[in-house]
UniProtKB/Swiss-Prot annotation:
GO molecular function: 1,4-dihydroxy-2-naphthoyl-CoA thioesterase activity
Keyword terms, alphabetized: Hydrolase
UniProt key word DNA-binding: no
Keyword Zinc-finger: no
Organism per entry: Pseudomonas aeruginosa (strain ATCC 15692 / DSM 22644 / CIP 104116 / JCM 14847 / LMG 12228 / 1C / PRS 101 / PAO1)
CDD domains documented for this protein: PaaI_thioesterase
Name under which the protein is recorded: Putative esterase PA1618
UniProt family annotation: Belongs to the thioesterase PaaI family.
GO cellular component: cytosol
């Protein structure tokens, strides 16, 4: 059984990134299945730190962007919206080029919070970062109880 309340439409998800940090960094939603959502980002001058490696903050932006969208797809958006409460990341190895791909899987989907495990890897498939994102599920004013 799928965890998605709304079936992900990758074209629509990518269009939603226009004029946002996701657009600026080249984040693209690429795939989904019943239990995960996948996005990637280029490792280039937009996402490098001064020594030519993928900036840890850029990895966190990818993780939070992916997990936030995953939470959005799990709620009734006519009654709720989701916002980040906490994100942490362990940077495991540096990347210099190519793409970094992130896969988000739910750890907990509660009434008021969602927790996501997000694994990032380089083109070689080796892990580069492990992140955990906690999202608040917030009722729209006057809509949910």
């Amino acid at each position: 059984m799928s965890l998605w309340r709304q079936t992900p439409d990758l074209e629509q998800l990518n269009a939603s990134q226009k004029n946002s940090i996701g657009d600026l960094l080249g984040i693209r939603f690429e795939a989904f299945d019943d239990e995960s959502l996948t996005a990637s980002m280029p490792v280039d001058s937009r996402t490098h730190q001064p020594f030519g490696l993928l900036h840890g903050g850029a990895s966190v932006v990818l993780a939070e962007s992916l997990g936030s969208m995953a939470s959005y797809l799990c709620v009734d958006t006519s009654q709720y919206y989701c916002v980040g409460l906490e994100v942490n990341a362990n940077h495991l190895r540096g990347l210099r080029s190519g793409r970094v791909t992130a896969v988000a899987r739910a750890i907990h989907l509660g009434r008021t919070t969602h927790v996501w495990d997000i694994r990032l890897s380089g083109d070689d498939g080796k892990p580069s970062c492990i992140a955990r994102l906690t999202m608040a599920v917030v009722p729209l004013a006057g809509r949910a109880g």
